[in-house]
Amino acid sequence: MPCGGASGGADRGAKYPKTGLAPTPMPRAFKIPQSVLVVIHTRALEVLLIKRADAPDFWQSVTGSKEHTQDGYRQTAVREVLEETGIDCGPGTTLGDGLLDWRLENVYDIYPRWRHRYDAGVTRNTEHLFGLVVPGDIPVRLNPAEHTAYRWLPWRDAAAACFSPSNAEAILMLPRMMCPGEPP
């Protein structure tokens, strides 16, 4: 018999037998105000932008917070890229060497609409920047709970399409990060 009994699933209205009370949900953990921004691009400087599900006019690069304070930024970048695009750039993969730590951070005010996700009093986030070079024909598989569409744009157009100023600034740095010392 499958877990959850003959119905194949748990009874959502289940109560504890002795008290008659419904189980108390686990408290929701607050987001850690340390995140990554990963600019995914081709060698031709075409940039992948993804459209947020919770803010339909917001186009962005891959972003996401650390799940645990001890997580490294690279570990967070690999996880977020895989979760949001289906692209695996973990150690030992063909794209693993393409994930470059730009060794830059942005500190910015968290948008008021998202502050409820953080502990009381947290208003600023530190964002660590990465670039990921990929082949132009790489398949993209979005997580529909987070993003609803994607598009590839030339780097300047991608920067202009971003809702986040820090994301736009990161994309505008892309030519310098790919070819240090050369003007864009």
Predicted regions and their residues:
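Active-site segment of metal-dependent pyrophosphate-handling enzymes
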Residues: I87-I138
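Conserved Nudix-box catalytic region and its N-terminal flanking loop in Nudix hydrolases
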Residues: T42-G90, G96-D97
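Short aromatic/basic micro-patch
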Residues: Q60, R124, W152
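NUDIX/MutT-family hydrolases
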Residues: E127-L172
